[in-house]
Amino acid sequence: QGSCTIQARNRFALKDAAAGYDYTTADVPAEKLFGYIAQQIGQIAQPGVVSPLGHTFSFPCQQFALNRAQLIHWTKEIKTSGVEGQDISALLEAALAKANVTNVRPQAVINDTVGTLLAAAYGQPDVDIASICGTGHNTCYLEPKHPLNGQPMIVNMESGNFDEVPQTKHDRTLDEASDRPGFQKLEKMVSGYYLAEVVRTILADLAEQGGYAWGACLTQRQLIQGRDLDNILADKGDLPATKTFMAERLGATECTPELLAAVKTAVTLVATRSARLVAATFAGALLHIDPKLERRHVIAIDGSLYEKMPGYAAMISEGLRGALGVRAAQVSTILAKDGSGVGAAIAAAV
């Protein structure tokens, strides 16, 4: 291991209703999106200092070189025009030049899972799988001997696009209403962007079957937020947080204990299914690279679900035990907070 210094890093939203901007819609061209990114980079770049830039790009790409990747298609309901099929680094380089940020040189563009693996493995040699369990979902792993060249290679699985998992009617409803029906089916069943929407469709069905008037508001997409699920999952006793959610979010001020319990159960089942499906993808990768699980494996995970959703990390561990039995003792998971950004910096430095 060597040492390197990350000169600067920053997070910024691509859409902010309060500030009145959204760079993720179809009427926004690539130039505006990357111009905004270049503007943000310019604000933290050190004047007069040439800085290599590591860029995490969390969407399916065809990689041609460390700093050359072409977007195949958007996911997570992003629709910015003129980006699909284009070289991401070239778009960023053009935007940096236009913004006169000439001292920042894009050196690496990598998937966020790859960045997470690089960051975690830099400090823990047993890390050979990395995953994002947050707004979106994807996993990569270290192939010990890739058939293309016989050398170790990080493989981006794009596991969010796995599509053989049986869907419920609620999954099908969500998928059909999405921007890309039939794509990213697993991601729509496990990721933070969609879990609240799955719960919304379940509650809409519950309201219709029970004749509840509060079901009328559940036609509104994004009505339920991830923090609502977190509060309900952590709720205990008489379920006061669930009662507050029903009153404030859905306008249901008179809820029986049975109804509150049903809502809590629905949220718990959606979260548990997510964690177990994620664990199943981990188990598949593990058994591919080490069929008998003869050595130690560490899975590095970044993302809000793993970090913040109550019980989610434990659910993944339970899912691994269910899939691998006693051999799961060879596997552990760790939080790699901001791993994707740190990993991009490492990729730019080496």
State where each predicted segment sits:
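Acidic, glycine-rich loop-and-beta core segments that form the ion-binding/anion-interacting portion
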Residues: 142, 146-189
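Conserved beta-strand elements of beta-rich interaction domains across eukaryotes
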Residues: 17-19, 58-62, 136-138, 144-146, ...
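Glycine-rich phosphate-binding loop and adjoining helix at the ATP-binding site
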Residues: 6-42, 50, 61-121, 127-129, ...
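ATP-binding/phosphotransfer module of carbohydrate and carboxylate kinases, centering on a glycine-rich
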Residues: 1-22, 28-51, 97, 122-123, ...
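Gly/Thr-rich phosphate-binding beta-strand-loop-beta motif of the actin/hexokinase/Hsp70
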Residues: 1-7, 63, 130-143
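Active-site nucleophile and cofactor-binding loops and adjacent substrate-binding regions
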Residues: 79-84, 105-114, 130-133, 188-191, ...
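A short acidic Gly-Thr/Ser loop motif
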Residues: 1, 58, 113-114, 132-136, ...
